[in-house]
UniProtKB/Swiss-Prot annotation:
Gene coding for it: lipB
EC number from the UniProt entry: 2.3.1.181
Class of enzymatic activity (EC top level): transferase
Sites marked Lowers pKa of active site Cys: 132
Entry GO CC: cytoplasm
UniProt KW Protein biosynthesis keyword: no
Positions that bind substrate: 69-76, 135-137, 148-150
Pathway entry: Protein modification; protein lipoylation via endogenous pathway; protein N(6)-(lipoyl)lysine from octanoyl-[acyl-carrier-protein]: step 1/2
Domain of life: Bacteria
UniProt name for this protein: Octanoyltransferase
Active-site residues, Swiss-Prot/TrEMBL: 166
Swiss-Prot/TrEMBL keywords: Acyltransferase, Cytoplasm, Transferase
Misc note: In the reaction, the free carboxyl group of octanoic acid is attached via an amide linkage to the epsilon-amino group of a specific lysine residue of lipoyl domains of lipoate-dependent enzymes.
Residues covered by the BPL/LPL catalytic domain: 30-203
Length: 203
């Protein structure tokens, strides 16, 4: 069964513990369900496995979590929708295909509100003509996934100036509200619709 669970606003540690608990249960076969956890985080930086010291400039009093996902450092905060799929992928679905599907969820969501978004060669995430609107960083072990994707709705971009987001020096971060007026709860509903449609192809 595919379950969509809205955690509301969370501290990063809380959401990480939920993911890890379900992830371990799925690895052992104790949990046969598949989950998309949705949240907004209180301010936090997360640093993936390719983070270099020069990618973190000055995070001041905001915590930094070094975690086991792909990618470099990013910021999470209010005004950003974060989606954590904890899934058992169908046989033969590659990590590349899985990431493609997560990106597709975002591309189709923002297309509904008139934003043209796309992928870039050799980069993960979703981009627009005004900058990067969504980041992707995942871990897949024995076909089970964790971590995920974050979509910027109206997040405070100043926090991204304290890091080199995703290790990309020359592409700014952008919000949905750089293009159109947007209510985060309405965007979330559109996102969930595409999560259900695309997510069923993965499990």
């Amino acid at each position: 069964m595919l379950k969509i669970i809205d955690l509301g606003k969370t501290e990063y540690q809380e959401a990480l513990e939920i993911q890890n608990r379900i992830f371990e249960r799925k690895l052992t076969g104790e949990d046969q369900d598949n989950y998309f956890f949705i949240t907004e985080h209180h301010p936090v930086y997360t640093a993936g496995k390719t983070t270099k010291p020069e990618h973190i400039l000055n995070t001041e009093d905001i915590p930094v979590y070094y975690i086991d996902r792909g990618g470099s450092v990013t910021f999470h905060g209010e005004g950003q929708i974060v989606v954590y799929p904890v899934l058992s992928l169908k046989n033969r679905i590659s990590v590349k295909r899985y990431v493609f599907t997560l990106e597709e969820i975002v591309i189709k969501t923002v297309k509904e509100i008139g934003i043209n978004a796309y992928r870039k060669d050799r980069l993960r995430g979703v981009f627009t003509d005004k900058g990067k609107i969504a980041s992707v960083g995942v871990k897949v072990s024995k076909g089970v996934t964790k971590h995920g994707i974050s979509l910027n709705v109206n997040i405070e971009k100043r926090y991204f100036r304290r890091i080199i987001p995703c290790g990309i020096w020359d592409i700014p971060v952008c919000n949905i509200t750089d293009f159109v007026e947007a209510d985060i709860d309405k965007i979330k509903l559109k996102l969930i619709k595409h999560i259900i449609k695309e997510g069923r192809k993965l499990v």
